[in-house]
Amino acid sequence: MKQLFLIIGAPGSGKTTDAELIAKNNSETIAHFSTGDLLRAESAKKTERGLLIEKFTSQGELVPLEIVVETILSAIKSSSKGIILIDGYPRSVEQMQALDKELNAQNEVILKSVIEVEVSENTAKERVLGRSRGADDNERVFHNRMRVFLDPLVEIQNFYKAKHLHKIINGERSIEEIVNEMQKYILSFAN
């Protein structure tokens, strides 16, 4: 059975970098996916699902939830790795509930933990505005992204805490310290 770890955190928390480094350090056993990459890859395949994804994204619309969850589960199941890290998901209560429903309806993938990389809003802001990835990384957009992250956060935290799946990792430290702690935690499930 595949072991799934969801990695969540504010914009600038380092969740993607952390997940990428852990997958790279453990390339035999761990795969890392981001939801956006999965949707783009599926779209590029021109499958029935891919064409549907393209129809929405080309119009600048959100891809329907069921399609996103199907795409995620399909990628997990087809991966040759036993441990899967997905960063930036869930971003909403609806995404959380949809994934939970799908995971409960099958027996190939088990959610082992939701790891939250926790940083202060000031740290997140410094990191995002300091790295200037593009025009969207300005202050107004940062605050909007932060709001989108924070609005459902307590409900998401409480849902996974009730299932004893929520783990907080202090993201205010060096990348090495964060990656080491997260990697040790993830690998503790493999034994």
UniProtKB/Swiss-Prot annotation:
Positions of AMP binding: T35, R40, E61, L62, V63, G88, Y89, P90, R91, Q95, R133, R145
A family per Pfam: ADK
Pathway per the UniProt entry: Purine metabolism; AMP biosynthesis via salvage pathway; AMP from ADP: step 1/1
Listed PROSITE patterns: ADENYLATE_KINASE
Entry EC no(s): 2.7.4.3
GO cellular component labels: cytoplasm
LID as annotated region, ranges: 130-136
UniProt entry keywords in alphabetical sequence: ATP-binding, Cytoplasm, Kinase, Nucleotide biosynthesis, Nucleotide-binding, Transferase
Binding site for ATP: G12, S13, G14, K15, T16, T17, R131, R173
One record GO biological process: AMP salvage
Top-level taxonomic group: Bacteria
Region (NMP): 34-63
Catalytic activity: AMP + ATP = 2 ADP
Subcellular location: Cytoplasm
Function text: Catalyzes the reversible transfer of the terminal phosphate group between ATP and AMP. Plays an important role in cellular energy homeostasis and in adenine nucleotide metabolism.
PANTHER family reported in the protein's UniProt record: NUCLEOTIDE KINASE
Domain notes: Consists of three domains, a large central CORE domain and two small peripheral domains, NMPbind and LID, which undergo movements during catalysis. The LID domain closes over the site of phosphoryl transfer upon ATP binding. Assembling and dissambling the active center during each catalytic cycle provides an effective means to prevent ATP hydrolysis.
Entry's family note: Belongs to the adenylate kinase family.
Name the UniProt record assigns to this protein: Adenylate kinase
